[in-house]
Swiss-Prot record:
One of its GO terms (biological process) is lysine biosynthetic process via diaminopimelate. InterPro entries: DapB_C (IPR022663), DapB_N (IPR000846), DapB_N_CS (IPR022664), DHDPR_bac (IPR023940), NAD(P)-bd_dom_sf (IPR036291). Its EC number is 1.17.1.8. Keywords: Amino-acid biosynthesis, Cytoplasm, Diaminopimelate biosynthesis, Lysine biosynthesis, NAD, NADP, Oxidoreductase. The keyword Disulfide bond does not apply. It comes from the Bacteria. NADP(+) binds at R39. The lineage of its organism: Bacteria, Pseudomonadati, Pseudomonadota, Alphaproteobacteria, Hyphomicrobiales. (S)-2,3,4,5-tetrahydrodipicolinate binds at H161, G170, T171. PANTHER family: 4-HYDROXY-TETRAHYDRODIPICOLINATE REDUCTASE 1, CHLOROPLASTIC-RELATED, DIHYDRODIPICOLINATE REDUCTASE. Catalyzes the conversion of 4-hydroxy-tetrahydrodipicolinate (HTPA) to tetrahydrodipicolinate. This is 4-hydroxy-tetrahydrodipicolinate reductase. It comes from Sinorhizobium fredii (strain NBRC 101917 / NGR234). Transmembrane segments: none annotated.
Length: 272
């Protein structure tokens, strides 16, 4: 541990992703766990964060006081829920620190509040923090631009574990936005997220989404470009959620030297 290590806070510390973040921060170079936060009625308040994450004691108790933690830290890693993320965005803006957001399912109003907080904080937000998925997004945009809507249909298929509460996934939407950008269209106008009953022929130029849920699947995503007589499939499989945690740590370290503003993983990876 070095005095120059970036001091990070993990919020939602008791969740699956929170525990993964704690382990990743503990093992990564250039960062250290400053605090771990849970909701005020959590039975884990007071527990050692390292013990909860399977590391053994690390001397960082779980607390329910985010602002106190934020003002002494340099960054926060947030894979919680939209309401919590909006609250943490305001606190991160007060503390003027880096806020890395992997939370999905945010509404347009949530997004507006997060972007407002980015006037004072350095916000890095992405539907997926992994290098592979963000590269897949770039490839999807390129393919969508090269293959015309007249002859090629785009469908996005995703599968996640049974506990995931939002659909389509943030990653599927990220890929949909990439495809829409390649086509020069607005995803909100062209997305088809539900098909049921007699739907009629597929409208030209739309981008379809299909969602699967079951088991303990970390994340499977495929972008399918279907033409006449040929099929192009671009896919990514996540086998360990630590890939998202490593990406979040990389985003925090990158954001440390940036000006306040709203960024994505494409900025972090130099792909924008």
């Amino acid at each position: 541990m070095s005095e120059t290590d970036m001091k990070l806070v993990v919020v939602g510390a008791a969740g699956r992703m929170g525990q993964t973040l704690i382990r990743t921060v503990h093992e990564a170079a250039g960062v250290r766990l400053h605090a771990a936060i849970e909701r005020s009625n959590s039975p884990f308040i007071g527990r050692d964060a390292g013990e909860l994450a399977g590391l053994g004691p690390i001397g960082v108790p779980i607390t329910d006081k985010p602002l106190e933690a934020f003002v002494e830290a340099e960054g926060v890693l947030d894979f919680t829920a939209p309401a919590g993320t909006v609250e943490f965005a305001g606190l991160a803006a007060q503390a003027r620190i880096v806020h890395v957001i992997g939370t999905t399912g945010c509404s347009a109003d949530d997004e507006a509040k997060i972007r407002a907080a980015a006037r004072h904080a350095r916000v890095v937000k992405s539907g997926n923090m992994s290098l592979g998925v963000n590269l897949l997004g770039v490839l999807t945009e390129t393919a969508a631009r090269a293959l015309s809507a007249k002859d090629w249909d785009i469908e996005i298929l995703e599968m996640h574990h049974r506990h995931k509460v939002d659909a389509p996934s943030g990653t599927a939407l990220l890929l949909g936005e990439a495809a829409a950008k390649g086509r020069g269209i607005d995803l909100a106008d062209q997305a088809v997220k539900v098909r049921d009953g007699h739907t009629g022929p597929r409208p030209q130029g739309t981008i379809g989404f299909a969602t699967l849920r079951g088991g303990l699947v970390v994340g499977e995503h495929s972008v399918i470009l279907a033409g006449e007589g040929e099929l192009v499939t671009l896919s990514h499989s996540a086998t360990d959620r630590s890939i998202f945690a490593r990406g979040a740590v990389a985003a925090a370290l990158w954001g440390r030297s940036q000006k306040p503003g709203f960024y994505t993983m494409l900025d972090v990876l130099g792909l924008n």
